[in-house]
Amino acid sequence: EFQDFREYDYELIMALTKRLNNVVLVGDYHQHSVSATNNSGKPFKNKSKDVSYDDFVAELRNSGFEVDLTTLNKSRRCSAEICNYISEKLHISITSNGDHSGSVVWIDDDPTVVLNQNQITKLVFNEAASYTFHAMNWSYSKGDTVNSACVILTDGLDNLDSESFDPEKVKLTTLNKLYVAMTRSRGDLYLIKASTFKKLKDAYIAH
């Protein structure tokens, strides 16, 4: 999880690599800044500006690393359909090794069927504990695998299903958290808009 090392921890790792031979660092750029702690500063922030994927790769190469972008690019969790959808919508390159099958399903026309199924894990942006259904926050789901997931979107992502959706206009940390949420399921991935869920939300709030 090389992407989780920030600031002094990152500098320590980089210093150690200059002293050791045959160092292999494994990580996913698109999962940085997802955790609630240790998610700011170097190497993914340059002052107040986000460091892009290309700039981060260039920095590693300038530091003497050979950067392998393909060996671990295939998901052992997500289906080809889900990986293709993520690549298309989020502009994040990900492919599937074909171990699992699953579809991307928008459920705005009939959301209660999925929301009422306990076997389907609901992934919300925050405050997961406030709901009666089994839910996890997007960021806390990192590293987990579920049989099927329902991602409840935020207001700013309500147009994810539109051809006009532009991931470049989404805050990088939010995009990374969405990427994490959308890659948790080994089966189907259900998506519901914030505008749809708001109409039903009160029925699922724990009292």
Go through the PLM ranges and name each one.
Residues E1-N116, T121, F125-V180, R184-H207:
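Conserved helicase motor core of SF1/SF2 NTP-dependent helicases
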